[in-house]
């Protein structure tokens, strides 16, 4: 479903449900007038406030433990880069659905307490206006934080109560102006600003204290047992695959087989359909026609996380990571399917396959596990993405321009890593690359795409010495006879 579709359904569905409740013949809900005077608890106002405070502290503490656990890092990753999560094999829709249900349950507890306090249940209490107020609380306090919505709710409620009594004609204008000012000048909200101030003060107070050596506090790297043992002789087979965008045909009848322990490079001019082919292999909803077989299983119309479960791992043309997470958190995220993350504990040790450990040691990322991803160089980000994909233990590794933007020494290192992978892992590698020297050095076979068609599939020597390939890269017109040659 598109974001627009979800937004419309989210807005319209509650309206329909409310109208159905209004029209029920038994008047169980009191229709549009609501319910009043029903039996409640005999508690004083002060006791109700104590209950409200206790419930707030309980759920806030539980949320803090949850967000700071290993599973909480998954939620942060989904918020930051949902597509990358899906291609790592994480069922983001399932996680968001359960999170939505849990949030609704907490809201139900709050509604139960509020109804018991006021002895009134009416539709307008939790209507569209109240929903808008919740969004304002979140935006003002700081989205992506736990304390932010609490701060926003307290500030707005207290200021509204004070201003409505002293400035009854302009208080809404003042509150609205403050909200607009915060959105314009402090878009992250008040809570992050307060936390930055606290960190600044702490940095000044403890400036003379001995600094902790980050190398002494690194998570322990443990060799994980290799679990992907169901790799077929032909892990990847593409049959008559085509992709249309409206009336434009981008891929036409692509047939391709890749055997185990083989590196196959896809080359071709810009616009040949190379990245589109990658998308069609790694996302079952992309192809218009044809089929993709992974380890003998026909993929069909399935999502990227289901294809990852079958054994497909993919890196992107533009490095796709989680800028706000640490290197260790990213690697732990990649092991989501192999090791279910704890919901209330933050386990530091990392169980990683040998291929991932080799990359970390070769690039010295094993000494930077606590470093934020946003602080890494482009070359290290490329290496980290490859390490994450290998941590999922794929049998088919898809690499889209893995050497883009790298120095010569970094390209040499990547070439060495990829060739070593075939010696230690039963997998096949399909990569897109424009660096023909790199392709020549590591490839078992080369596939040539041109205008969405597979023109040539042969050994390195056959492709390098092909007059057809020279014609393509020189920009000469290719005839139908040459295409079918």
Each language-model region and where it sits:
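Catalytic Walker B motif of ABC-type/P-loop ATPase nucleotide-binding domains
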Residues: 397-401
């Amino acid at each position: 479903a598109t974001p627009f579709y979800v937004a419309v359904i989210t807005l319209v569905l509650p309206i329909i449900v409310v109208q159905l409740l209004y029209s029920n013949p038994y008047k169980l809900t009191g229709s549009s007038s609501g319910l009043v005077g029903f039996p409640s608890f005999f508690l004083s106002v002060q006791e109700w406030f104590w209950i409200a405070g206790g419930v707030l502290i309980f759920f806030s503490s539980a949320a803090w433990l949850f967000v700071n656990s290993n599973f909480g890092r998954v939620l942060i990753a989904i918020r930051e880069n949902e597509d990358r999560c899906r291609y790592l094999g994480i069922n983001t829709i399932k996680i968001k659905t359960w999170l939505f249900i849990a949030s609704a349950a907490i809201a139900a507890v709050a509604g139960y307490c509020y109804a018991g306090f006021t002895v009134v249940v009416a539709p307008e209490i939790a209507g569209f206006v109240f929903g808008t107020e919740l969004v304002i609380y979140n935006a003002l306090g700081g989205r992506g934080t736990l304390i932010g919505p609490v701060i926003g709710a307290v500030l707005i409620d207290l200021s509204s109560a004070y201003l409505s009594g002293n400035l009854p004609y302009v208080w809404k204008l003042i509150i609205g102006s403050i909200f607009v000012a915060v959105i314009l000048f402090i878009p992250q909200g008040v809570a992050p600003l307060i936390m930055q101030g606290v960190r600044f003060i702490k940095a000044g107070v403890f400036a003379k204290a001995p600094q902790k050596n980050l190398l002494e506090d690194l998570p322990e790297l443990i060799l994980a047992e290799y679990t992907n043992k169901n790799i077929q002789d032909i892990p990847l087979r593409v049959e008559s695959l085509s992709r249309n965008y409206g009336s434009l045909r981008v891929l036409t009848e692509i047939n391709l087989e890749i055997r185990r322990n083989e590196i196959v490079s896809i080359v071709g001019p810009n616009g040949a359909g190379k990245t589109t082919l990658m998308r069609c292999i790694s996302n079952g909803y992309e192809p218009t026609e044809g089929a993709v077989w992974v380890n003998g299983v026909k993929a069909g119309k399935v999502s990227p996380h289901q294809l990852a479960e079958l054994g497909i791992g993919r890196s992107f043309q533009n490095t796709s990571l989680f800028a706000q997470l640490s290197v260790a958190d990213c690697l732990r995220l990649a092991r989501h399917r192999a090791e279910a993350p704890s919901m209330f504990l933050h386990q530091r040790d990392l169980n990683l396959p040998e291929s991932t450990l080799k990359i970390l040691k070769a690039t010295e990322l094993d000494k930077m596990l606590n470093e934020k991803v946003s602080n890494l160089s482009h070359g290290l980000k490329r290496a980290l993405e490859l390490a994450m994909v290998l941590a999922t233990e794929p049998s088919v590794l898809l690499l889209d321009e893995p050497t883009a933007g790298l120095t010569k020494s970094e390209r040499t290192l990547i070439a060495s890593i990829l060739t070593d992978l075939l010696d230690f892992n039963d997998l096949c590698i399909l990569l897109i690359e424009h660096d023909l020297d790199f392709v020549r050095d590591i490839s078992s076979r080369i596939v040539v795409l041109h205008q969405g068609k597979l023109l040539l599939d042969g050994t390195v020597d056959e492709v390098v010495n092909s007059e057809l390939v020279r014609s393509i890269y020189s920009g000469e017109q290719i005839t139908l006879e040459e295409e079918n040659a």
